Amino acid sequence: MKENAEQKSGHVTTRRLLDMKQNGEKIAVLTGYDYTIARILDRAGIDVILVGDSASNVFSGHTTTLPITVDEMIYHARAVVKGVQSATSRAMVVVDMPFMSYQLSEEEALRNAGRIMKEHECDAVKMEGGSSIAATVRRITDAGIPVMGHLGLMPQSIYKYGSYKVRAQEGAEAEELMKDARLLEESGAFAVVVEKIPSALAGEIARSLTIPVIGIGAGVECDGQVLVINDMLGLNREFHPRFVRQYADLNTIIEDAVGRYLEDVRSGDFPSPEESY
């Protein structure tokens, strides 16, 4: 997005997020995967829209985030950016780098990050990992691409850990996570997501870093919160983890609307003369 457009619209930037942390303003993040929802989120005033690799789950029906590709992420990101640009152009758009798009080499990671940025004008990319990706984060940020980190429960490593349980509950893992958070900051990350870790640890990390710490299942002491929009809107009645607050029950609302539509079509009540030409 062009600088003059950012200035006119109050577009959220990495600098703005840092100011929010310093001023004690909480940062609100939601995932988004399409044009229509992105327009709604931007108009509602959301700070950051994360084009998450969770699209692999909620859009494609996979059981993990691993199958989604760079091309598919670009497809979703392009739609989200267009949605934001057609609304108020305020929200920052951050795009997940999918599994194996940055693990092979620094060069491959930079190429994919550059492609994601160039092909749809997003604001930043997000990567999972600590010390193992620190050099890659540095390489990408040195090229002018902002990077958001992700620690704690890392869905792309689900087969390594074997479960979605809370991470860093014991001293050694908690200490390692703290070191990784500091290392990501030193490597140039502008923010870091911490997922499903003890709230006390998340608060300690937030206080020890100068960059924003965004929590998901990590307690209220983080600098901001992120949720998958499908979860907080109640679109999947079978999935309701402890850390999700459900703000609507769209599953029931949509089922009811479809049921009434079916009834009206089959009875001949729809379309009415007023709805016909």
Curated annotation (Swiss-Prot):
Catalytic positions are E195
Q: Which organism is it from?
A: Chlorobium phaeovibrioides (strain DSM 265 / 1930)
Recorded hits in InterPro entries, A to Z, give: Pantoate_hydroxy_MeTrfase (IPR003700), Pyrv/PenolPyrv_kinase-like_dom (IPR015813), Pyrv_kinase-like_dom_sf (IPR040442)
> What single Pfam family name could you report for this chain, choosing any that match?
Pantoate_transf
Which cofactors, if any, are listed as required?
A: Mg(2+)
On the tree of life, the source organism's domain of life is Bacteria
* EC category name: transferase
Any idea which UniProt keywords this protein has? Cytoplasm, Magnesium, Metal-binding, Pantothenate biosynthesis, Transferase
- Provide the Gene Ontology terms for cellular component: cytoplasm
Q: What is this protein called?
A: 3-methyl-2-oxobutanoate hydroxymethyltransferase
Pathway where it operates:
Cofactor biosynthesis; (R)-pantothenate biosynthesis; (R)-pantoate from 3-methyl-2-oxobutanoate: step 1/2
Q: Which residues bind Mg(2+)?
A: D53, D96, E128
Q: What does this protein do?
A: Catalyzes the reversible reaction in which hydroxymethyl group from 5,10-methylenetetrahydrofolate is transferred onto alpha-ketoisovalerate to form ketopantoate.
Quaternary structure, from the entry: Homodecamer; pentamer of dimers.
Q: Where does 3-methyl-2-oxobutanoate bind?
A: D53, S54, D96, K126
- Taken from the UniProt record, the cysteine pairs bridged by disulfide bonds within this chain are none
PANTHER family in the record: 3-METHYL-2-OXOBUTANOATE HYDROXYMETHYLTRANSFERASE (PTHR20881:SF0)
What family is this protein classified in? Answer: Belongs to the PanB family.
Q: Which reaction does it catalyse?
A: 3-methyl-2-oxobutanoate + (6R)-5,10-methylene-5,6,7,8-tetrahydrofolate + H2O = 2-dehydropantoate + (6S)-5,6,7,8-tetrahydrofolate
Enzyme Commission number(s):
2.1.2.11
List the NCBIfam families hit by this protein, alphabetically.
panB, PRK00311.1
Question: Which locations, inside or outside the cell, does it occupy?
Answer: Cytoplasm
Note how many cofactor molecules are bound and how: Binds 1 Mg(2+) ion per subunit.
User: Can you provide one Gene Ontology molecular function annotated for this UniProt record?
Assistant: magnesium ion binding
Alphabetically, which GO biological process terms does the record hold?
Answer: pantothenate biosynthetic process
